[in-house]
Amino acid sequence: MTIKVEQAIIHEIAQTHEGQLSCRLRPQPLLNSQAVELMLEELHQSYTSKSGKGFGFFGTHGNDGEANPAFANCLKDYLDGGLGFVEFTGVASKLLQDELGKYDFSQGGFLLLACYSHMASDYLFVALLSAKSSMTVLDDMELTQVNHLDLNNIQLAARIDLTEWQADKESRKYISFIRGRAGRKVADFFLDFMGCVEGINPKAQNKSLMIAVEDFVAGSELTKDERQACRDKVFEYCSERFDAGAEVDIKDLADELADSGMDSFYDFATTGNYDLEEEFPVDKSTLRQLKKFSGTGGGVTISFDGHHLGERVIYDPISDTLLIKGVPANLKDQLHRRLKGE
């Protein structure tokens, strides 16, 4: 187990026969059984590995639009010992019920709240889970339908870094959340019930880092291979941070580059017009451009490793053409077969 579970509970928000939402509150926390530990371990791993998450903080009513501070206030009371875990989660369920009541599309679900620690940080995980039907075989070999929690397709979940929240009140990224498939709008009501305001933009920060790296190598005396090695080093560092659930640390990254003979990146990145935070979450899809060129348009999709540019792949900006030397064998075979058939 990579996490230590402190407390967890599940409450249900469901529709009554009259179409109204109501809460069915569990009166005590879940037992720290193997089933609970395995479920939270699975959720921790899958949540941590999700890319494209949003980041935010608890807003202040009046200063951050209509941010409702009720959830944050209750959470603070719980952490200070003024509220028990069951009482805090019960209030949270009522807040979510009230928020869901503003919309016509909601069917409710099972609200999971879990406090756990991982490495040096304490977290509160909040997720609205749905039930999914499946089939099973009974002892007498008859089929029957059963419901189970759908842990593989969670769309409404957030994680609060309690350690960061308590240590740095100015932080704007101690709450992470899953973005809906159509963008943040899908998860608005879930963030609103917590009073979460979107803060740092990871994609923009990673884009700025990529631009800073490109400017850094362009202004250096590095050879072509050394420049690509620098890009690869940055991508490798960021990938390792992502896999560990950690953030990009510009000073730490600069030290890694310095160990490889590429000095002064920290001063270059922080004094230039890149608006980089000292630390920010990794967005691998953005940084992948350090290693690969790819693009799609007009029915054509092209992707190739960066070190091939200027060698196997030649770009002529004047004629707007790409020359590919050494066509991949499987593509060449398809082309030959098509030409023979014409």
Curated annotation (Swiss-Prot):
Keyword annotations of the record: Cytoplasm
PANTHER family named in the record: NUCLEOID-ASSOCIATED PROTEIN YEJK (PTHR38772:SF1), PTHR38772
Organism: Shewanella amazonensis (strain ATCC BAA-1098 / SB2B)
Subcellular location: Cytoplasm, Nucleoid
Signal peptide stretch: none
Cystine pairs: none
Name listed for the protein in its UniProt record: Nucleoid-associated protein Sama_1557
Similarity annotation: Belongs to the YejK family.
InterPro entries: Nucleoid_associated_NdpA
Transmembrane segments: none
Sample GO molecular function, one term: single-stranded RNA binding
GO cellular component, one term: cytoplasm
